[in-house]
Every structure is written in C-alpha cells, then in structure tokens.
Design a protein with these regions (language model features):
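Hydrophobic alpha-helical transmembrane segments
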Residues: 1-46, 50, 57-70, 75-222
Length: 222
C-alpha cells in the first residue's frame, strides 16, 4: 500500500485542483476556496494525516525520553504545540492554494496536483529500509523498513519532472519539490531519533510538511 501511496496522491491532487477550480469558478473568494480545498483533502483522508501532524509536533515539543514523547503523542488530544502546528500548516496550505487559484497561468492547477502528490512521495521515503518502527504494534510496525530506496527515487523522478511544468520558471518547480522532499527526510530522521523509531503519526507529519512546503514554494513562481 505504501508503494502505491503516490497514486493516491495523484488522485487526491486532481480532486483538490477540481475543488479549487470549481469553488473559484462560482465566485467564491479564492482564499476561502483554498480553505475548502484543504478541508476536502482532510475529509478525504478522514483526518488521519492532520492528526499525525498534531501528535508529532506535540511529541517533539515535550521533554523527556522517547517513551515520554510517545506517551504525549498517544494521549488522545491535541496539545498547544499540535494546535499551533495545525493552524500554521493548514493555514499556509489554504493561502497557497488561494494564491494559485487566482494565478493567471496555465500551470496553477499542475502546482496543486504536484503539491498534494509530493506529500505521498515523502511517505515512501519515510518508510524506506533501515528506518525501524518505534513499537512492535500499530501502523508504524506494518510499514516501517518496508520500502527500498529505489522505490522512493522512482516516484520522485516523475514528480520532479512534473513540477517543472508547475510554474512559469521551469527550474523553480524541481528545486522546490526536491528541497521539500529533502527537508521531509531530515525531519523524519529527527523524529525517528526523538521517538525511538517510526510510527503512523510521523508519516502524517512528513506528508503535511511536504505538501505545505511544496505549495508555498510553488507560489514563488507566479
């Protein structure tokens, strides 16, 4: 399932572009349209990834050993760090999609698709061989250490190629997308060290981080 995650990202990216186009076409404020698009993405994934984002940031924000960080992550509610992260990350996504919606460029919808798909490629990187689970149970145990590095690279190549068509500056899209994936890999490495391994929440964090960085970066090409 993880190996095919980018296919889900492509489907969700197309759906997001359609929602953004449809809502702005009927006259909705582009920033409200961006917010609705982000909400539709969260609804389409049952909020799993945004929940993982909040839990991971709460875990990173606490003191103590990995066991304590995992306890905070699994406490069942979003703490102040998690709430702030949701506000910042989802807010940046919404505003970025709003900016893309009003861009007078044929590349704007490709940028939405690339942003969403990039998050799923980041998940494949996060599950690459050598990254172990933080617990023998849970979703992380099912997917950690499961993907060869070449699988993530294979998905990265078409994504980066597509990103060249996501802005009017052909070089900017690949630079933004590759940078977002690299930052995600480094952040996952830190999370694995901080939490004592990979879990499902970290995947949500990696995904939302990459979507946010890519969407924000691609607005620079407008």
């Amino acid at each position: 399932a993880i190996a095919a995650a980018p296919l889900t990202g492509i489907a969700l990216g197309i759906a997001a572009a359609f929602v953004l186009w449809g809502t702005t076409s009927i006259g909705l404020n582009p920033y409200l349209a961006g917010l609705l698009t982000v909400g539709a993405l969260a609804l389409g994934t049952r909020g799993m990834h945004v929940d993982g984002l909040a839990d991971s940031v709460d875990g990173l924000g606490c003191y103590g050993p990995p066991e304590r960080a995992r306890e905070v992550m699994h406490s069942g509610g979003a703490g102040p760090f998690g709430v702030a992260a949701l506000f910042i990350f989802l807010g940046l996504q919404s505003v970025s999609f709003g900016v893309l919606a009003v861009a007078d460029s044929p590349t704007q919808w490709i940028a939405v698709l690339v942003s969403v798909a990039a998050g799923r490629v980041a998940v494949v990187f996060a599950c690459r061989r050598g990254i172990l689970a933080s617990s023998p149970s849970g979703f992380g145990a099912l997917v950690a250490d499961s993907q060869p590095l070449w699988a993530a690279i294979v998905w990265s190549v078409p994504l980066i190629v597509a990103s060249a068509f996501a802005t009017d500056r052909w070089w900017l899209g690949p630079l933004v997308t590759a940078s977002a994936l690299l930052i995600s890999v480094l952040c996952v490495r830190h999370c694995v060290r901080r939490f004592g391994g990979l879990n499902g929440d970290v995947l949500g964090f990696a995904l939302e981080l990459t979507v946010t960085l890519t969407a924000v970066g691609l607005t620079l090409g407008l």
